[in-house]
Swiss-Prot record, chain A:
Protein name (record): Dolichol-phosphate mannosyltransferase subunit 3
GO cellular component, one term: dolichol-phosphate-mannose synthase complex
Signal peptide region: none
Subcellular location: Endoplasmic reticulum membrane
């Protein structure tokens, strides 16, 4: 089974479980506070997934190792290459 | 470690995501179990907004993505038309 099929199966199973529980189709009598938590659950999972993604991106940006020497070396190499190509006649 | 603005922006994103996550968790998960007379309910909107606001934000995001794609496509079309 492909990854897409797996994901769709998982979503379908979780979605139908949630729908069955919120519409009361299973005939369970959940306490009112549990029902109150249950019905926004898909929105909650989406928002927490978004927050996790945002936080991970921010954390990786903050802890990315800069290489000052390599950056300077690269910039000087770029200047060198531009001068060389301009001398050979390439117009930027 | 990253330096300067990178660190500030990165940690800012982490802080924003944590704030949103804790507020939203308290709103959706914790509030139904707290007695409705408690003063903390004053700090949260009615529960219907817990789904309406992320939904509206998601639609806005889709709108901006669509507008950006349209803009880029129109610009590239104009560039190819100019070089023809």
């Amino acid at each position: 089974m492909t990854k897409l099929a797996q994901w769709l199966w998982g979503l379908a199973i979780l979605g139908s479980t949630w729908a069955a529980l919120t519409t009361g189709a299973l005939g369970l009598e959940l306490p009112l506070s549990c029902q109150e938590v249950l019905w926004p659950l898909p929105a909650y999972l989406l928002v927490s997934a978004g927050c996790y993604a945002l936080g991970t991106v921010g954390y990786r940006v903050a802890t990315f190792h800069d290489c000052e020497d390599a950056a300077r070396e690269l910039q000087s190499q770029i200047q060198e290459a531009r001068a060389d190509l301009a001398r050979r006649g390439l117009r930027f | 470690m990253a330096t300067g603005t990178d660190q500030v922006v990165g940690l800012g994103l982490v802080a924003v995501s944590l704030i949103i996550f804790t507020y939203y968790t308290a709103w959706v998960i914790l509030l139904p179990f707290i007695d409705s007379q408690h003063v903390i309910h004053k700090y949260f909107l009615p529960r219907a907004y817990a789904v309406a606001i992320p939904l509206a934000a998601g639609l806005l995001l889709l709108l901006f993505v669509g507008l950006f794609i349209t803009y880029v496509m129109l610009k590239s079309e104009r560039v190819t038309k100019k070089t023809q």
